């Protein structure tokens, strides 16, 4: 291979390596290796060497460094990367490469950086040999707020959990967080062991049951329920999270155990509808849950509805699930009262649902202008077109559709509205002034072109635009219309 190197000039080999982005070519012999200081490939050669366990390459570079009579560019290049050895320590703690960690330590890596986080990664991934090595290097068992059992529980290594507890690690830190993480990742045997050791399944308002339900671990849910007798099903969101994530069997199990379907006025069926889980919705409907128009109050942002008059069908519309909407209509859900679903579909950009609702006989006259306003505010051009073509008034509410489009910076919608009769001078030239405030030169030029009055721009407007830092539009006004700050 040495002879091959000399078949071409160095400059050609550099171009070949740069073009192919193939670092391995540099490792074929020392002649090619010396090109390392000349190439411009994206890959970090030092990183490539370490991650592939080419320690003999590092030994070679180390020997070059010892030769004080000559300067080798590759030595300097490798030295640039030795200040970041700890990130490779973390990688090897995760992948379980103890020998590589030892080599990094011999090169000067500090395994205790960032409050012994390397220890956590080794524990999380179940590498006992690395754990013991790090402890021998002074790592603190109680660093990072004594979270080692949490890490082992998260990673699912029962033997590591047992060992840590046997040497005094806290398995109940932060209100039984290790138990919750074991529930989250589905490690039933660790859950059982922690409970046997004294972990409380009721901690954090039954968060372990809620977490297992959310993640779909039916076996863990059953085990936890069997270990508690005081669940307040009136306020337990386990079934709601199970419904949200399409875990039908868990929903059924929790209902059989007494879960309250009317929690927060029916958020269980709402989250199932919003996320498109038709089987769960059908199951809940079979139990008699109301789907009509009703007042609900949900005191948590988890389910996206707060203090609104909301029919369940609105949740299906919000999620864009046409089949769910059709199902609700087929079993009698109201879609005509206040046209709530229609406006909701316009807000969330679901044109096919709008067309379906129209086909089912809703009256466009009632809420079409409101639907137009919300569609403009959200940037849904195709819905705006559909509504205008079906009678929506682009001048409604003193030109509010255009104002909403301007505020959202939706120039395509603004152009469409203007082409259909919207007045760019309405509401004290709001369209132009909003474009100026946002600093959008293209939009400013467009509104002036179609008739916005630049003479309505006051000195106060200019000062406000200046405070906002819109220098480009200010310069345009000055150079084109001689309008400038006084």
Curated annotation (Swiss-Prot):
Q: Which UniProt keywords apply?
A: ANK repeat, Repeat
**Which top-rank group of organisms is this from?**
Viruses
Please name the Gene3D superfamilies in this protein's record.
Answer: Ankyrin repeat-containing domain (1.25.40.20)
ANK repeat segments = 84-113, 114-143, 145-173, 174-203, 205-233, 234-263, 265-293, 307-336, 337-366, 367-396, 398-426, 427-456
**Family annotation (Pfam families):** Ank, Ank_2, Ank_4
Q: Which InterPro entries match?
A: Ankyrin_rpt, Ankyrin_rpt-contain_sf
> What is this protein identified as?
Putative ankyrin repeat protein R634
């Amino acid at each position: 291979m040495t002879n091959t190197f000399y078949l071409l000039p160095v400059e050609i080999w550099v171009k070949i390596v740069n073009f192919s982005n193939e670092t391995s070519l540099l490792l074929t012999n020392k002649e090619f290796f010396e090109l390392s200081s000349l190439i411009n490939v994206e890959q970090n050669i030092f990183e490539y060497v370490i991650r592939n366990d080419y320690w003999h390459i590092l030994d070679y570079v180390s020997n070059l460094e010892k030769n004080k009579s000559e300067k080798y560019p590759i030595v300097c290049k490798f030295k640039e990367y030795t200040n970041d050895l700890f990130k490779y320590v973390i990688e090897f703690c995760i992948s379980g490469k103890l020998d590589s960690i030892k080599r990094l330590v011999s090169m000067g890596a500090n395994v205790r950086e960032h409050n012994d986080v390397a220890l956590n990664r080794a524990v999380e991934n179940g590498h006992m040999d690395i754990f013991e090595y790090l402890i021998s290097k002074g790592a603190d068992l109680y660093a990072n707020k004594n979270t080692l059992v949490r890490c082992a529980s998260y990673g699912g290594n029962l033997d590591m959990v047992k060992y840590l507890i046997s040497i005094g690690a806290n398995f109940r830190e932060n209100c039984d967080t290790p138990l919750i993480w074991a529930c989250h990742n589905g490690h039933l045997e660790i859950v059982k062991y922690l409970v046997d050791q004294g972990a409380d399944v009721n901690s954090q308002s039954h968060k372990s049951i809620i977490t297992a339900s959310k993640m779909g671990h039916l076996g863990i849910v059953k085990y936890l329920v069997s270990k508690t007798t005081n669940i307040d099903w009136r306020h337990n969101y386990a079934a709601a999270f199970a419904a949200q994530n399409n875990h039908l069997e868990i929903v059924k199990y929790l209902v059989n155990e007494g879960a309250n379907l009317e929690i927060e006025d029916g958020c269980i069926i709402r989250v199932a509808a919003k996320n498109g889980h038709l089987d769960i919705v059908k199951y809940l409907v079979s139990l008699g849950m109301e789907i009509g128009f009703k007042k609900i109050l949900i005191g948590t942002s988890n389910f996206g509805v707060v203090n609104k008059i909301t029919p369940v069908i609105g949740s299906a519309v919000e999620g864009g699930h046409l089949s769910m909407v059709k199902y609700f209509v087929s079993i009698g859900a109201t879609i005509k009262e206040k046209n709530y679903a229609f406006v909701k579909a316009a807000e969330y950009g679901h044109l096919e649902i709008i067309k379906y609702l129209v086909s089912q006989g809703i009256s466009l006259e009632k809420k079409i202008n409101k639907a137009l306003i919300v569609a403009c505010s959200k940037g849904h051009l195709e819905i705006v077109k559909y509504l205008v073509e079906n009678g929506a008034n682009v001048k409604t509410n003193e030109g509010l559709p255009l104002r909403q489009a301007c505020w959202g910076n939706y120039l395509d919608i603004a152009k469409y509205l203007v082409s259909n009769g919207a007045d760019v001078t309405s509401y004290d030239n709001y369209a132009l002034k909003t474009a100026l405030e946002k600093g959008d030169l293209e939009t400013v030029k467009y509104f002036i072109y179609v008739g916005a009055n630049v003479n309505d721009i006051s000195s106060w407007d200019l000062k406000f635009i200046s405070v906002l830092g819109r220098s480009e539009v200010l310069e345009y006004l000055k150079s084109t219309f001689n309008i400038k700050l006084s």
